[in-house]
Amino acid sequence: MASSQRITLDQWKKKAAKVELNDTQKQEIKEAFDLFDIDGSGTIDLKELKIAMRALGFEPKKEEVKQLIAEIDKEGTGTICFEDFFAIMSVKMSEKDEKEEILKAFKLFDDDATGSISLNNIKRVAKELGENLTEDELQEMLDEADRDGDGEINEEEFLKMMKKTSLY
């Protein structure tokens, strides 16, 4: 995810240009911004950035907000314009949607609702899909994603594995 590495404002804007948001999402970003742009200047106070992000359903960590501010506020004005806010929130919303889709897939595997995917879960899905894989091949798939070595794939491990693929 973008929050774990340094990313420049230009990189945010390039990523945002590739994002397709629906009209409702665009409106939500605009409304969150306008809520804090009380004087209509087209900018919001950087202290309000965290609150505006929360209004859009994000729980940004203090460190993430500091990092965003360092990248956005190069001139030290203490404000962020709508264009920059929109670019950042567009990327954040697309990442959130992506995560939700991956977690839906996780739940399809985790049909016994244990919070993790076992070898038996993978066997069932492979059978349902008509995949003729040996137990060794299925075990290899599980081992590839099982980072903590507990013999099962939890949500975090599944998210990491899926983000490495070109599917998401």
From Swiss-Prot:
Phosphorylated on Thr-134 by casein kinase II (CK2) in a light-dependent manner. Ca(2+) 1 binds at residues 37, 39, 41, 43, 48. Gene3D superfamilies: EF-hand. Signal peptide: none annotated. Keywords: Calcium, Cytoplasm, Cytoskeleton, Metal-binding, Phosphoprotein, Repeat. GO terms for cellular component: centriole; ciliary basal body; cytoplasm. SMART domains: EFh. The modification Phosphothreonine is found at residue 134. PROSITE patterns: DEAD_ATP_HELICASE, EF_HAND_1, EF_HAND_2. Its main location: cytoplasm. It is found in: Cytoplasm, Cytoskeleton, Microtubule organizing center, Centrosome, Centriole; Cytoplasm. InterPro entries: CALM/Myosin/TropC-like, EF-hand-dom_pair, EF_Hand_1_Ca_BS, EF_hand_dom, RNA-helicase_DEAD-box_CS. GO terms for molecular function: calcium ion binding; G-protein beta/gamma-subunit complex binding; heterotrimeric G-protein binding. The keyword Calcium applies. Ca(2+) 2 binds at residues 146, 148, 150, 152, 157. In brain, specifically expressed in ciliated cells. In retina, expression is localized to the connecting cilium and basal body of photoreceptors (at protein level). Highly expressed in brain, kidney, lung, retina and ovary, and weakly expressed in spleen. Not detected in testis, colon, stomach, thymus, skeletal muscle, heart, intestine or liver. Pfam families: EF-hand_7. Residues 24-59, 60-95, 97-132, 133-168 form the EF-hand domain. The keyword Repeat applies. The fourth EF-hand domain has been proven to bind calcium. Ca(2+)-binding protein that may be involved in basal body assembly or in a subsequent step of ciliogenesis. Interacts with G-protein beta-gamma dimers in a calcium-dependent manner. Belongs to the centrin family. This is Centrin-4.
